């Protein structure tokens, strides 16, 4: 298994697919990285030489924010919104949808399981 950006990527998959196991690298960035390094699209990870793996590592380190750094930045952005006390920050703090979605019904994923409320007896 090749270890890139602190992640063991699967050896039997194509390089473009395997790179997407790294948090912060999707299909577009994986394609860009392989083109930059000059690896054919059909090549599998176990067929890569150590030099090619090193080139991929360097390309990711230079141009992309991945894994822990990316997670930390996203968490800091959310914390900043909450500290500002803006509308988006309040929605994050209350664990409600942030982007204007309906909450009267739906939003169960964000709000958690339904809480039972005693109703009128018939």
UniProtKB/Swiss-Prot annotation:
**NCBIfam families attached to this UniProt entry:** uS13_bact
Kindly indicate whether the keyword Protein biosynthesis belongs to this entry: no
A GO molecular-function annotation:
rRNA binding
Q: How does it assemble?
A: Part of the 30S ribosomal subunit. Forms a loose heterodimer with protein S19. Forms two bridges to the 50S subunit in the 70S ribosome.
Looking at the keywords, is Endoplasmic reticulum present?
no
Instruction: For this UniProt record, give its keywords in alphabetical order, as a comma-separated list.
Output: Ribonucleoprotein, Ribosomal protein, RNA-binding, rRNA-binding, tRNA-binding
| Annotated protein name in UniProt | Small ribosomal subunit protein uS13
Output a single Gene Ontology CC term carried by this record.
Answer: cytosol
Q: List, alphabetically, the InterPro entries matched.
A: Rbsml_uS13_C, Ribosomal_uS13, Ribosomal_uS13-like_H2TH, Ribosomal_uS13_bac-type, Ribosomal_uS13_CS
Q: What does this protein do?
A: Located at the top of the head of the 30S subunit, it contacts several helices of the 16S rRNA. In the 70S ribosome it contacts the 23S rRNA (bridge B1a) and protein L5 of the 50S subunit (bridge B1b), connecting the 2 subunits; these bridges are implicated in subunit movement. Contacts the tRNAs in the A and P-sites.
Matching entries from Pfam families are given as: Ribosomal_S13
- Name the HAMAP family for this protein: Ribosomal_uS13
Mention one GO biological process in which this protein takes part, according to its record.
Answer: translation
User: What family is reported?
Assistant: Belongs to the universal ribosomal protein uS13 family.
Ranges where the record places region Disordered:
97-122
